[in-house]
Amino acid sequence: ISSGCGTTGALSCSSNAKGTCCFEAPGGLILQTQFWDTSPETGPTDSWTIHGLWPDNCDGSFSEDCDPSRDYTGISSLLTAQGASDTLQFMNQFWLNDPDDGSNEELWEHEWATHGTCYSTLQTSCLPEGSPKGAEAVAFFEQVVTLFKTLPTYEWLTNQGIKPSSSTTHTYSALTAALEAEAGVIPALNCDGSDLDEIYWYFHLRGSVIDGEFEPISAPEKGDCPSSGIKWLPKNNEK
């Protein structure tokens, strides 16, 4: 579907304007969040996996669960019915729940209900007339996958000589410098203790989440990893 917005409008967070179908607000600070799960391992050994796409407010606060009437279930069926089976196939490889926490479907339902329903540009009133129910969620999942494909965190780290290891330790600044050399912006790194397990890539948006232009920006704050002694552990098939 097309939003009809184009990509020449104002960048999100550039003004205090109210949210519209073509200007994302108040959640104009957008995070593409990725997991690195090693215990239990999820996803390919040479790729991070998708956590979600979150609309933070420009000051770093955020809203959640913005429209319970659109808490869709059966995301697989929704995607398949609306011609997005390629997106679904990719999600089944790269957007995976921790098996201890539930099914992939449950993670997708949670990410849409908790975060997806909060985008001003994904309100049902923004959809082309005659759009099927859930079309805005399909557009959300398609965009998350599209954006994730532009953020090959594993490849970027290994390009800079940083590889998963159970013994090597890194400083926060060395990891972010390596990623900045590849991506041009600095992400936020989160850890479980001192083990790197999540990364946040930040954007402002011009236009709609459906088909707008995501402009990468550096993280406005650091993640919770320590300043040194960080390990990027390998995925060891510890299932």
Swiss-Prot record:
Keyword NAD assigned: no
GO cellular component: extracellular region
Keyword Hydrolase listed: yes
Keywords: Disulfide bond, Endonuclease, Hydrolase, Lyase, Nuclease
Classification via SUPFAM superfamilies: Ribonuclease Rh-like
Disulfide feature: C5-C22, C13-C58, C21-C126, C66-C118, C191-C225
Described purpose of this protein according to its UniProt entry: This is a base non-specific and adenylic acid preferential ribonuclease.
UniProt-recorded name of the protein: Ribonuclease Le2
Organism expressing this protein natively: Lentinula edodes (Shiitake mushroom)
Taxonomic placement: Eukaryota, Fungi, Dikarya, Basidiomycota, Agaricomycotina
